[in-house]
Amino acid sequence: MEKIIKEKISSLLSQEEEVLSVEQLGGMTNQNYLVKTTNKQYIVKFFGKGTEKLINRQDEKYNLELLKDLGLDVKNYLFDIEAGIKVNEYIESAITLDATSIKTKFDKIAPILQTIHASGKELRGEFAPFEEIKKYESLIEEKIPYANYEAVREEVFSLEKRLADLGVYRKSCHIDLVPENFIESPQGRLYLIDWEYSSMNDPMWDLAALFLESEFTSQEEETFLSHYESDQTPVSHEKIAIYKILQDTIWSLWTVYKEEQGADFGYYGVNRYQRAVKGLASYGGSDEK
């Protein structure tokens, strides 16, 4: 692997620059490496096994270029779809946020989401949650291993009409707001990275993802929304509740597919599925029109 990495980033290096070390990092979707050279450090990502069926890399590459002027992401130096590799800027001594630290950064995160949602950018790709569920179902080869899946699925799909009644607004969205996709430089600049799933969707999807992935309390959600909500970025609590259910359903199926490809995520998938079931039980709609 080190040999492949050296070959791929050689075009980025000056004549006197050479690779000193290659260190593997974590990542649920891709294989990530920190590459140190005599002059610089890079993050090298190899697209994970089976991800070509999940992620449209042509769309991702286009979206990264389109969003570049917003200044939200780290620099991308190389995006080679055929080779399945991406080389990004490494932020020295950056702190990766987690489910605790993210809750101290509302004043920085809210403007980032406002910027993308109100940008008017027409991203490639439409993130259609119900189609995503069908996609993963078609990719999974074995019987879906979750209790009462067919009955739960029927209940999940009953939300489609309610969403349509509420109105789904097409805006540019990140889609995958896990806390680890926010990194902060020593100077205090916050970056939003990993735009693989970026596409057009309702901004409430992003808010639901932010809240779910970092397990916000109801009070923390309301506090964040007080930073985010504006005339350009309105809020729908009911859509957030629906999107939480859809996200847990989708990522529980994503886990089944990835584990069929050889990954092992322990109880991650079943925990998300069970949370979707709980979300359905507690969802009561609202008076939103």
List the predicted regions and their residue ranges:
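ATP/Mg2+ or Mg2+-diphosphate-binding catalytic cores
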Residues: 254-289
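A general structural signal marking secondary-structure boundaries and capping sites
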Residues: 16, 71, 94, 113-121, ...
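Extended, well-ordered alpha-helical scaffold segments
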Residues: 105-108, 148-159, 265-279
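All-alpha amphipathic helical-bundle segments outside canonical DNA-binding/catalytic cores
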Residues: 234-244
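An alpha-helical support segment within catalytic cores of ATP-dependent transferases
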Residues: 1-16, 20, 121-175, 186-187
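Active-site acidic catalytic loop and adjacent metal/ATP-binding pocket
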Residues: 29-37, 43-44, 160-207
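Active-site activation/catalytic loop segments of kinase-like enzymes and analogous catalytic loops
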Residues: 204-232, 245-263, 275
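ATP-binding pocket architecture of kinase catalytic cores
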Residues: 23-24, 29-128, 146
